[in-house]
């Protein structure tokens, strides 16, 4: 079965310079939710219109694209993809702004369509407040009556048309061009194709979220909240502990291992993988990173980093792109790393910047250490070998190498390589001037300062 996704609408109520269908929901463009589901059934095509170039950049390359330059209704959109309609197979119609339609529901729809041998199978839903929706009217044949055309009796019907259909390709091809635009809007409505057949069946879903469209940012937020709840509940059923699901935001693309604990106000985004027995949060953001087992990340930000097993990060740490922490590393408060590999059992506990650095195993980085990696034109590397001890308040001016088991004195500015097993000092010698304060104040240690 092929799928044609209609996604050419203007999306005016979003009040955005971006097409509606590329707005992200839990890390994934809205239309890609639909495409990923549709791909389970076969080949996928999309009908685009408004700012189609932007949409084309986010959808997979194997999706066929058709353009609807003028938005003249749903039937007109299908006509734009006329060549995509199969002659001997079925066609599923979906919408780029209805992101959460499920595979299971569509599979039921397909099963009913095949078993009933219908020309059209309609997905319906029951709404307590169906105002604004087309009603399913059951008589000698099934009809769809739009809300604006419904009398009081029909308006009491709670079964509505979701706009999702499966057509026999042959029937659709033979009749789509018969649809007229003799209505106030001068548009071609796909529902009008029902005039050409009595061979219609329906399937009803009781999950309203999966057939709810996004028209504005309020609906976008509501749908995202509902889906976030489902994602968090799925993770909890799989063995993840989420202390407060309502305050935790996890993208659909994230993977988390068993017995990991997620504390409140944590954001886990993109292609992130987290192992087992970790503690994440509170107040932590992790994006596009790979984290091993038994890792603690507390009140910190991690992006495009690799963290191996048994590592501790935070509080108030920032791991930037290219950071690789090997097992048993400790990164403490107010430490920032970027494009740095930090070896096993190494510690950087306080107030440190490590950029473009390669650091060995069992190294101690003293508080206040800075790798001075940028000379105003280009970045330079710092190398610190196994067992080195970097004193507090050090500036390591790259390019520079600290050898194996070498030590640098506290307060040093290191501008030259320090050989292994050596001590590097780069600071002014302390001078003590006795009784300087007394002489400065004319011999009166408690003299008041002049106003």
Curated annotation (Swiss-Prot):
Region (Linker): 218-238
Region called N-acetyltransferase, residue ranges: 239-451
Cofactor(s) listed: Mg(2+)
Binding site for Mg(2+): 97, 215
Listed EC numbers: 2.7.7.23, 2.3.1.157
Family listed: In the N-terminal section; belongs to the N-acetylglucosamine-1-phosphate uridyltransferase family.
Keyword Nuclease found: no
Residues holding UDP-N-acetyl-alpha-D-glucosamine: 6-9, 20, 68, 73-74, 95-97, 134, 146, 161, 215, 320, 338, 353, 364
UniProt pathway annotation: Nucleotide-sugar biosynthesis; UDP-N-acetyl-alpha-D-glucosamine biosynthesis; N-acetyl-alpha-D-glucosamine 1-phosphate from alpha-D-glucosamine 6-phosphate (route II): step 2/2; Nucleotide-sugar biosynthesis; UDP-N-acetyl-alpha-D-glucosamine biosynthesis; UDP-N-acetyl-alpha-D-glucosamine from N-acetyl-alpha-D-glucosamine 1-phosphate: step 1/1; Bacterial outer membrane biogenesis; LPS lipid A biosynthesis
UniProt superkingdom: Bacteria
Active site: 350
Species of the source: Thermosipho africanus (strain TCF52B)
Main location: cytoplasm
Pfam family, one: NTP_transf_3
Cofactor remark: Binds 1 Mg(2+) ion per subunit.
InterPro entries: Bifunctional_GlmU, GlmU-like, GlmU_C_LbH, Hexapep, MobA-like_NTP_Trfase, Nucleotide-diphossugar_trans, Trimer_LpxA-like_sf
Any one GO cellular component localisation term in the record: cytoplasm
Catalytic activity: alpha-D-glucosamine 1-phosphate + acetyl-CoA = N-acetyl-alpha-D-glucosamine 1-phosphate + CoA + H(+); N-acetyl-alpha-D-glucosamine 1-phosphate + UTP + H(+) = UDP-N-acetyl-alpha-D-glucosamine + diphosphate
Subunit composition and interactions: Homotrimer.
Function: Catalyzes the last two sequential reactions in the de novo biosynthetic pathway for UDP-N-acetylglucosamine (UDP-GlcNAc). The C-terminal domain catalyzes the transfer of acetyl group from acetyl coenzyme A to glucosamine-1-phosphate (GlcN-1-P) to produce N-acetylglucosamine-1-phosphate (GlcNAc-1-P), which is converted into UDP-GlcNAc by the transfer of uridine 5-monophosphate (from uridine 5-triphosphate), a reaction catalyzed by the N-terminal domain.
Stated name of the protein: Bifunctional protein GlmU
Key words, A-Z: Acyltransferase, Cell shape, Cell wall biogenesis/degradation, Cytoplasm, Magnesium, Metal-binding, Multifunctional enzyme, Nucleotidyltransferase, Peptidoglycan synthesis, Repeat, Transferase
């Amino acid at each position: 079965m092929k799928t044609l996704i209609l996604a050419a609408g203007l999306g005016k109520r979003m009040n955005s310079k971006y097409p509606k269908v590329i707005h992200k929901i839990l890390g994934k463009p809205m239309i890609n939710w639909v495409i990923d589901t549709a791909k389970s059934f076969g080949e996928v095509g999309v009908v685009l219109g408004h700012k189609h170039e932007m949409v084309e950049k986010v959808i997979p390359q194997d999706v066929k694209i058709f353009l609807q330059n003028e938005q003249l209704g749903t039937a007109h959109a299908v006509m734009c993809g006329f060549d995509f309609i199969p002659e001997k197979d079925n066609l599923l119609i979906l919408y780029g702004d209805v992101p959460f339609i499920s595979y299971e529901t569509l599979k039921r729809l397909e099963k009913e369509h095949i078993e009933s041998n219908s020309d059209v199978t309609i997905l319906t839903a029951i709404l307590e407040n169906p105002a604004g929706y087309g009603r399913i009217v059951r008589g000698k044949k099934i009809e769809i009556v739009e809300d604006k055309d419904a009398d009081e009796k029909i308006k009491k019907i709670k079964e509505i048309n979701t706009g999702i259909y499966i057509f026999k390709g042959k029937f659709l091809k033979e009749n789509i061009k018969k649809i007229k635009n003799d209505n106030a809007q001068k548009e071609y409505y796909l529902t009008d194709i029902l005039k050409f057949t009595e061979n219609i069946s329906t399937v009803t879903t009781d999950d309203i979220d999966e057939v709810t469209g996004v028209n504005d940012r309020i609906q976008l937020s509501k749908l995202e909240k509902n889906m976030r709840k489902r994602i968090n509940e799925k993770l909890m059923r799989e063995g993840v502990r989420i202390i407060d699901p309502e305050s935790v935001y996890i993208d659909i693309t994230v993977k988390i291992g068993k017995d990991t604990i997620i504390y409140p106000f944590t954001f886990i985004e993109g292609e992130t993988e987290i192992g087992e027995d970790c503690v994440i949060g509170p107040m932590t953001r992790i994006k596009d990173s790979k984290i091993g087992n038994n890792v603690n990340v507390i009140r910190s930000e991690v992006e495009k980093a690799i963290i191996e097993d048994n590592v501790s990060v935070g509080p108030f740490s920032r791991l930037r792109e290219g950071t690789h922490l090997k097992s048993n590393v400790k990164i403490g408060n107010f430490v920032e790393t970027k494009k740095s590999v930090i070896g096993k059992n190494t510690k950087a506990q306080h107030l440190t910047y490590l950029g473009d650095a390669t650091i060995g195993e069992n190294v101690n980085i003293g508080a206040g250490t800075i790798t001075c990696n940028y000379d105003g034109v280009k970045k330079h590397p710092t190398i610190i070998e196994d067992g080195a001890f970097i004193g507090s308040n050090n500036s390591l001016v790259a390019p520079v190498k600290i050898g194996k088991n070498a030590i640098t004195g506290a307060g040093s500015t290191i501008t030259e390589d320090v050989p292994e097993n050596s001590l590097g000092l780069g600071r002014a010698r302390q001078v003590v001037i006795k009784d300087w304060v007394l002489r400065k104040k004319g011999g009166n240690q408690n003299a008041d300062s002049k106003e």
